[in-house]
Amino acid sequence: MAFGGAQASYINPVVPFTGMIQGGLQDGHKITIIGAVLPSGGNRFAVNLQTGYNDSDIAFHFNPRFEEGGYVVCNTKQRGSWGTEERKMHMPFQRGCSFELCFQVQSSDFRVMVNGNLFTQYAHRVPFHRIDAISITGVVQLSSISFQNIRAAPKQPACSKVQFSQAVCLPPRPRGRKSNPPGIWPANSAPIAQTFVHTIHSAPGQMFPNPVIPPAVYPNPVYQLPFFTSILGGLYPSKSILVSGTILPSAQRFYINLRSGSDIAFHLNPRFNENAVVRNTQINGSWGSEERSLPRGMPFFRGQSFSVWIMCEGHCFKVAVDSQHLFEYHHRLKNLPAINNLEVGGDIQLTHVQT
């Protein structure tokens, strides 16, 4: 299926936040972050444009620091090692005040705009098409993260000229009280209707095409299960699969299978009666050893929406649930291009698929 969807914005994401950039970055893509710096609670925040959900490979680390008069550090991390810092001895952000931060991808560098004004340009140190995730940490409250392909929308400015003649500032947080900012829900407690906006309805801008093969997006509001579709070209390192839906109130289990012919290379099987997320591989009709360990509790809940992102790496699958990295599953079938079918079934309502 030809690619032609749009990546929905992240609305009121909770910090620390890590989310996927569907298809990876390309020349002409723009990411716009709307938020506010908290009045207190720390001296720094950071925006990382990175590969995957871990922080060992960060193509662009943008790190405002409210220290020594205020400055911004820009850097790149490769295989866990930081490069040479670039410091901008000017602070365009104010504590307690709102901001618009825009990253525009150009062939030679990132163009960074703050509140409609050019702040800096950061030359690429690694190929930008490897970037498929965005991570934000520190003393910020976020309203939205939106995505746009300005090459596909030439009538719109590269970065919106938002006038901040009167800064919108946040009151200091009362001492002894920690509350979520208005409109922000804790993990796994967002209303289903809110998630449906993210998974079914498109947002302004264009989804980013995959650097190798454009992903197929199936925007049907409801799918019949079991759902089965091909993965054009099969899997390869950096290829990602996105599956979103809502778990039925009386659900017992559901599954996501990545198949190679009659074999199942990766079987992801949340089981509510066992409070477990089972992973396995089936070869020639025989199942291997199950993997069940999780770094934290059950990430799926009856009656609630979910989003599963499966990133294929050279040695494993990396799996994130609701923008939180969950586990890695090492390949047992290692012929990745032969893994070319996706199957989804069980006690869910399926609302969004991207292969």
From Swiss-Prot:
Where does it localize? Cytoplasm; Nucleus; Secreted
What UniProt keywords are attached to this protein's entry? Cytoplasm, Immunity, Lectin, Nucleus, Repeat, Secreted
Please give the Gene Ontology molecular function terms for this protein: carbohydrate binding; galactoside binding
- Show which residues constitute the signal peptide: none
Q: Which GO terms describe its cellular component?
A: cytosol; extracellular region; nucleus
Q: Give residues annotated as binding a beta-D-galactoside 2.
A: 267, 271, 281, 287-293
Entry binding sites for a beta-D-galactoside 1:
48, 61, 65, 75, 82-88
Q: Boundaries of each Galectin domain copy? A: 17-148, 227-355
| PROSITE patterns on file | GALECTIN
Write down a Pfam family by its short name. Gal-bind_lectin
GO biological process, alphabetically ordered: immune system process; negative regulation of CD4-positive, alpha-beta T cell proliferation; negative regulation of type II interferon production; positive regulation of gene expression
Q: What is this protein for, i.e. what is its function?
A: Binds galactosides. Has high affinity for the Forssman pentasaccharide. Ligand for HAVCR2/TIM3. Binding to HAVCR2 induces T-helper type 1 lymphocyte (Th1) death. Also stimulates bactericidal activity in infected macrophages by causing macrophage activation and IL1B secretion which restricts intracellular bacterial growth. Ligand for P4HB; the interaction retains P4HB at the cell surface of Th2 T helper cells, increasing disulfide reductase activity at the plasma membrane, altering the plasma membrane redox state and enhancing cell migration.
Q: What information about domains appears in the record's comments?
A: Contains two homologous but distinct carbohydrate-binding domains.
Q: What is this protein called?
A: Galectin-9
Q: Which organism is it from?
A: Bos taurus (Bovine)
Taxonomic path: Eukaryota, Metazoa, Chordata, Craniata, Vertebrata
